[in-house]
């Protein structure tokens, strides 16, 4: 990983040369858009049963979230709500839910196989503080009231490496603004990727937002996982293949509007 960081407060991210922006003619992700496959390998019989029976109980319609916010989705009540966007096999999300039983977690994953995998883990651990949304995360964020989330995690997202596909990346000016709206003051957006270009892209987009501060004072702050981080299967594969990830944390500033 070659992201350049200076060892001082609020280091500057790479410039536009590292991540050219706005040259596709579409800066912002189209609302309600999803790009990619929704189903891959055939599900096992028990996974099919869980998708048919358990997923409807844990799923919800974002349009029905009222002024009380996503915390109302959970019973027993929770102290705060966090979201993980594109949770893959669910390793990180499940570990977080088990480690923080007083927090509510929403997992967004349109990929059916990912949903099936996490449902198996939810059943095995009798987890009660996870809710699932099998759609586009930008649609969910648009339905949330202001300052209703404590954290948003985006871990090893699809980098869409081809230039003509950059508009499909989740991190866009519009989604950064939406995250600032739904995160409470001092809330965090956390991003993990082993793709240099997407890390530079994310740093550049967040740096030009007045609503976020990059929480890195030294190189170790982004080169090493934060405390308690659970490595995903993809993350372990990247390490085996010699690719080093960056772990970026951004705080939602109190001056955001």
From Swiss-Prot:
Residues 1-42 are annotated as: Disordered. The active site is at residue 158. Its EC number is 2.1.1.33. Keywords: Methyltransferase, S-adenosyl-L-methionine, Transferase, tRNA processing. Pfam families: Methyltransf_4. One of its GO terms (cellular component) is tRNA methyltransferase complex. S-adenosyl-L-methionine binds at residues 84, 109, 136, 158. One of its GO terms (molecular function) is tRNA (guanine(46)-N7)-methyltransferase activity. Pathway: tRNA modification; N(7)-methylguanine-tRNA biosynthesis. PROSITE patterns: SAM_MT_TRMB (PS51625). It catalyses: guanosine(46) in tRNA + S-adenosyl-L-methionine = N(7)-methylguanosine(46) in tRNA + S-adenosyl-L-homocysteine. It is an enzyme of class 2 (transferase). Substrate binds at residues 162, 194. It comes from the Bacteria. Coiled coil: none annotated. Belongs to the class I-like SAM-binding methyltransferase superfamily. TrmB family. Catalyzes the formation of N(7)-methylguanine at position 46 (m7G46) in tRNA. This is tRNA (guanine-N(7)-)-methyltransferase. It comes from Nitrobacter winogradskyi (strain ATCC 25391 / DSM 10237 / CIP 104748 / NCIMB 11846 / Nb-255). The gene is trmB.
């Amino acid at each position: 990983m070659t992201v350049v960081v200076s060892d001082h407060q609020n280091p500057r991210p790479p410039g536009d040369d590292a991540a050219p922006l706005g040259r596709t003619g579409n800066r912002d992700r189209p609302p309600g858009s999803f790009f990619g496959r929704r189903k891959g390998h055939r599900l096992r019989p028990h996974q099919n049963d869980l998708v048919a029976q358990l997923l409807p109980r844990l799923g919800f319609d974002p349009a029905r979230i009222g002024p009380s916010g996503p915390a109302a989705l959970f019973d027993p009540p929770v102290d705060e709500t966090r979201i993980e966007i594109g949770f893959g096999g669910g390793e990180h999300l499940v570990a977080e839910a088990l480690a923080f039983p007083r927090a509510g977690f929403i997992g967004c994953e349109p990929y059916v196989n990912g949903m099936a995998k996490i449902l198996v883990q939810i059943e095995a651990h009798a987890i009660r503080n996870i809710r699932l949304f099998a759609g586009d995360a930008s649609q969910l964020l648009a339905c949330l009231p202001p300052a209703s989330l404590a954290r948003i995690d985006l871990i090893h997202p699809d980098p869409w490496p081809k230039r003509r596909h950059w508009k499909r990346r989740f991190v866009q000016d519009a989604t950064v603004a939406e995250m600032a709206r739904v995160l409470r003051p001092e809330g965090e957006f956390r991003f993990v990727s082993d793709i240099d270009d997407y890390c530079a892209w994310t740093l550049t987009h967040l740096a030009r937002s007045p609503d976020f501060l990059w929480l890195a004072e030294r190189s170790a702050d982004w080169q090493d996982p934060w405390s308690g981080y659970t490595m995903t299967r993809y993350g372990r594969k990247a390490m085996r293949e010699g690719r080093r990830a960056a772990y970026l944390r951004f705080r939602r500033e109190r001056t955001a509007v």
